[in-house]
Amino acid sequence: MIREERLLKVLRAPHVSEKASIAMEKSNTIVLKVAKDATKAEIKAAVQKLFEVEVESVNTLLMKGKVKRHGQRIGRRSDWKKAYVTLKEGQNLDFVGGAE
């Protein structure tokens, strides 16, 4: 069993993009920014416990940080982990429904 304190640190924020919106509509998949050291099992447990939905599968990938310039200085954004969480049939989770 994963401690509740760890579950709260696993999920960082929803990742809102055009691709994420299409994934939600077509395949009932939500896209989340998660902790870089989070495992698929931890992500699944955190989503099920915090949002009270049933998760079918979790796919993860590491996103490389972009190189950005600020004047003549060159910097780099941090690498981060993205998770595609597919919800079971009939389950629904809406992050941006109240933003209209």
From Swiss-Prot:
One of its GO terms (cellular component) is ribonucleoprotein complex. The keyword Ribonucleoprotein applies. It comes from the Bacteria. InterPro entries: Nucleotide-bd_a/b_plait_sf, Ribosomal_uL23-like, Ribosomal_uL23/eL15/eS24_sf, Ribosomal_uL23_CS. GO terms for molecular function: rRNA binding; structural constituent of ribosome. One of its GO terms (biological process) is translation. Pfam families: Ribosomal_L23. Gene3D superfamilies: 3.30.70.330. SUPFAM superfamilies: Ribosomal proteins S24e, L23 and L15e. Keywords: Ribonucleoprotein, Ribosomal protein, RNA-binding, rRNA-binding. Part of the 50S ribosomal subunit. Contacts protein L29, and trigger factor when it is bound to the ribosome. One of the early assembly proteins it binds 23S rRNA. One of the proteins that surrounds the polypeptide exit tunnel on the outside of the ribosome. Forms the main docking site for trigger factor binding to the ribosome. Belongs to the universal ribosomal protein uL23 family. This is Large ribosomal subunit protein uL23. The lineage of its organism: Bacteria, Pseudomonadati, Pseudomonadota, Gammaproteobacteria, Enterobacterales.
